[in-house]
From Swiss-Prot:
Highest rank taxon of the organism: Bacteria
Binding partners and assembly: Part of the 50S ribosomal subunit.
Alphabetically ordered keywords of this record: Ribonucleoprotein, Ribosomal protein
The keyword RNA-binding is assigned to this record: no
GO molecular function: mRNA binding; structural constituent of ribosome
Protein name per the record: Large ribosomal subunit protein uL13
Encoding gene, per UniProt annotation: rplM
Length: 154
């Protein structure tokens, strides 16, 4: 019996909707990264985009445990000498694009490369409760019910 290898033409993708309100960032990001990669399926193949399409709503209401809300720093470089910049998680969550905290957490849990970039395109993150994917009839996934630690104390 040969080892099973999924072909790209045989992939069946589902749409999954997750409400991130009150959920812990890292635990949610880990679960979503596995869904995007397709590791929750028995047909997982490392070199094939086998994951689901994931929609996350209320990304602005996620919870960071400990002192990460005030102390965690996100760094980037402008490309100019001395151009290192930083923002705290609090500044980002209270800023214009609060969904970026969750996007970055998920992005950093997915392997870098062409396949990882393609898998990240299957992720849609929205700060508010509205999304434009009703036509896809997404299946609701209750992450808070999977483990009591998934829900933050905020």
């Amino acid at each position: 019996m040969a080892t099973f290898s999924q072909k790209p033409a045989e992939v069946v993708k589902k749409w999954v909707l997750i409400d991130a309100e009150g959920l812990v960032v890292g635990r949610l990001a880990s679960l979503v990264a596995n869904r995007l990669r397709g590791k929750h399926k028995a047909t997982f193949t490392p070199h094939v985009d086998d994951g689901d399409n994931v929609i996350i709503i209320n990304a602005d209401k996620v919870v960071l445990t400990g002192k990460k809300y005030t102390d965690k720093k996100y760094y980037w470089h402008t490309g100019h000498p001395g151009g290192i910049k930083e923002r705290t998680a609090r500044q980002i969550l209270e800023g214009r694009f609060p969904e970026r905290v969750l996007e970055k957490a998920i992005e950093r849990m997915i392997p870098r490369g062409p396949l990882g970039r393609r898998q990240m395109k299957n992720l849609r993150v929205y700060a508010g409760p509205n999304h434009q994917h009703e036509a896809q009839q997404p299946e609701v996934l209750d992450v808070a019910a999977l483990n009591r630690k998934n829900k933050g104390n905020a």
